[in-house]
Amino acid sequence: MPEFRIEVAHDIAGCAATVALQEDTWSGDVVVPPQLMLAVVHNGGFVALGYAPDNPKPAGFVFGFLGIHDYHFRHHSHMLAVRDPYRGSGLAQQLKEAQRDHCLDQGIEIVAWTMDPLEARNARFNFGKLGAYTRTYHRDFYGAMPDKLNQGLPSDRIYVEWPIGHERTYKRLRGEDQPAPLEDAESEGIAYLLRADGDRPGGLAETTSASHLLVEIPRAFQELKARDPKLALQWRLAGRDAFERAFGEGYAAVEFLRAADGRGAYLLVPQPRRDLTLDTDEQ
């Protein structure tokens, strides 16, 4: 694993260094201008870049800004990107930890962001590595998006919340308290609200009265979308129905569980009052 150097951007050069990586990851149509990034940085926001040894180009970056949610300050992490050769290297976690340190210094308790709920790799990182959770679903949040990751489908998102000072977060970042395999949840009889039927999404279960629920998603959504856009849309709509129903009935997704054969599913539990941070130590 390469040792990355994390540099916090304080000037226009640092912010401008993110542009090529933004274009490679999404497209030139969705680039955040470095001038705007710099203004955000000088008003409580955060930009950090990760560099691999002997490579002057950034291997990844993270960008976020201050916001208010439910009358409390929090940090919104708008972008996180890592170049292909460095994905799975630990750089994404290093960038998130740098962002976390910045926010803790500001007295911020929650870092939040949106993510596509059907992206299994991102789910494993956000829920498994970081210890985040979600209880909010947004239909077509960004509208039609022209970039290569999102074009052709409604831009549905879950709103991910990361309690950066929570003991569970510390444990996850240290590699402790890792989620159990999906097979364990299945052997315990935890019910699926949504389960795959081959490559296709099955129908929703009739009841959500269980104490725990599973919502399965495709193993590799981008590959599925490239192969069969109509099937990808079926998954988008099925996932939408499952999450909206579960969240509407008081559940929150607190884990992403993986099986040895590559299957993956969110674990949902009943959530406490809306104004409380979820305590998921028991999961």
Regions found by a protein language model. Name each.
Residues 4-84, 257-259:
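A conserved beta-strand-loop-helix scaffold within acyl/acetyltransferase catalytic domains
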Residues 141-173, 268-278:
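C-terminal "cap" of GNAT-fold acetyltransferases
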Residues 86, 90-98:
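Conserved acetyl-CoA pyrophosphate-binding loop and the N-cap/start of the following alpha-helix
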Residues 38-49, 153-155, 248-254, 262-266:
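A short helix-loop-beta-strand connector motif used in the catalytic cores of GNAT acetyltransferases and
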